[in-house]
Regions:
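Alpha/beta catalytic cores of nucleotide-metabolism and tRNA/nucleoside-modifying enzymes
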Residues: 3-31, 172, 194-219, 223-351
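Active-site entrance/lid segments in N-terminal catalytic domains of soluble metabolic enzymes
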Residues: 4-216, 244-249, 345
Length: 351
């Protein structure tokens, strides 16, 4: 009886993260990485079309800035601006030619609700409705309201990590479901709440369900190396969102500090951290725990260097599997489970 009961509450199927797999090389007709095209063209269910590189900078205060959006738009990458209707509107009005590469970000806070009720703006190209727990009925109802207000926008909503979560959001009219709970470098939800899902399995399972409902997923969180972007695309992600890999750059707009040994560092924090709550919510409520980190990351100069590394890594992955573009990376790519992905014996000796 105990065994039967235990099987009801424990799913024993093995679940995988990105560190558990590698992409398998195969015959390739790609002669040079420069032959690989990273731009895609998509038409969504509401008839809206978009072309660009399906990578998104996360809507974190230290990443989703106007400066970041200006630079990433040059590479046709989307920046999900930090939360706030006015923050989006000021960018869109000043840079109408770059609006297609930014997203308005909303939450369940009073400011977001007021903006939806009162804003008189044309449909933004992208809208990201972002909460930590995408399973709440209140979140579903609010997302439906956003869809009704701006029917021509490409609507992103999340986060969830299961096929059931994807199905529920498909019912309220989203185009893209944001997938990932606890996988981000600044997230402590798995430690504090004990909740989460290994990110590779979440993306694989959610992408299959999304395809059945004719929508896509945004794989959000878990990026450590450029190669992880490629793994996301092989797993079926329509877009990949990242925060930590874009942190520490000039475009983040944060204060540059001197570390203990004189090295340059920048502040970076999760949006469920104590720092974020004190800055935007008047402090951490007495019924809540901080579920995000606050760290100082090494100062890395311009984000352009990081973009080159990301693009180069994805192109290299494509060349290894014979893919001339990202849709082909999904159809050609195969992932294999491994015990160890990287030889890091000299990792602390790089110059």
């Amino acid at each position: 009886v105990v065994v039967i009961y235990a099987s009801m509450i424990i799913n024993a199927d093995p679940k995988l993260d990105y560190s558990d797999v590698l992409i398998v090389p195969q015959k390739s007709n790609v002669k040079s990485r420069k032959e690989v095209c990273l731009e895609v063209s998509k038409t969504f269910n509401n008839g809206t079309s978009w072309s660009g590189v399906p990578i998104m900078a996360a809507n974190m205060s230290t990443v989703g800035t106007h400066k970041m959006a200006l630079v990433l738009s040059e590479y046709n990458i989307v920046t999900c601006l930090r939360k706030g209707g006015d923050y989006y509107s000021s960018f869109a009005s000043a840079n109408p030619d770059k609006e297609k590469y930014v997203s308005l970000t909303l939450g369940l806070d009073a400011e977001s609700k007021l903006f939806v009720d009162s804003a008189d703006i044309k449909d933004p190209t992208f809208i990201c409705v972002d909460v930590a727990n995408g399973y709440m009925t209140e979140f579903h109802n609010f997302t439906r309201k956003v869809r009704e207000k701006w029917p021509k926008s490409i609507l992103i909503a999340g986060n969830v990590v299961t096929p059931e979560g994807v199905e529920e959001l498909s019912k309220v009219g989203v185009d893209l479901v944001k997938v990932g709970i606890g996988s981000g470098s600044m997230c402590l939800t798995r430690r504090v709440a004990g909740v989460g899902y290994p990110q590779l399995s979440a993306v694989l399972e959610c992408a299959q369900t999304a395809e059945a409902f004719d929508i896509g997923i945004v794989a959000d969180g878990g990026i450590i190396h450029p190669g992880d972007f490629a793994k996301y695309f092989v797993a079926g992600a329509a877009f990949v969102m990242a925060g930590g890999i874009f942190a520490g750059h000039d475009e983040c707009g944060g204060e540059i500090r001197h570390g203990e040994h004189g090295e340059l560092r920048m502040l970076h924090y999760g949006m469920s951290s104590k720092t974020a709550n004190e800055k935007y919510n008047g402090g951490l409520s007495d019924y809540r725990a901080s579920e995000g980190r606050t760290v100082e990351v090494p100062y890395r100069g311009s984000v352009r260097n990081t973009i080159q590394e990301i693009f180069g890594g994805i192109r290299s992955a494509c060349s290894y599997v014979g893919a001339f573009d990202l849709p082909s990376l999904y159809t050609c790519g195969t992932l294999i489970k491994v015990n160890r992905t990287i030889n890091n014996i000299f990792e602390n000796h790089e110059i």
